[in-house]
Regions:
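Short, conserved beta-turn/loop elements at beta-strand boundaries and strand-helix junctions
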Residues: 12-17
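Short, surface-exposed secondary-structure boundary micro-motifs
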Residues: 51-52
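Conserved hydrophobic positions within beta-strands
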Residues: 7-9, 23
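Short, compositionally biased
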Residues: 56-67
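Short, acidic/hydrophobic/Gly-rich beta-strand patch recurrent on exposed beta strands
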Residues: 20-25, 33
């Protein structure tokens, strides 16, 4: 089992042929590798595990059923 957190991509950029994005987790923003989710772009939501976006998700999945 692993822990992943949902976040929203707010910026995309490339460093040394790696695709990265600034991902917002509420008020906190962190750089995240986006290479594993090539279909995710600014405005999309992803699940992040140890600095890597591992899954492209919907806004409903990101906010949960109670939001």
């Amino acid at each position: 089992m692993s822990f992943s957190a949902p976040g929203k991509i707010v910026q995309e950029y490339t460093i040394r042929n790696n695709r990265l994005g600034m991902v917002a987790f509420g008020d906190v923003r962190r750089p995240v590798f986006l290479d594993l989710v090539p279909d995710a772009h600014v405005g999309d939501y992803v699940r992040v595990h140890v600095g890597f976006a591992i899954e492209h998700i919907t806004a409903e999945e990101a906010h949960g059923p109670d939001c």
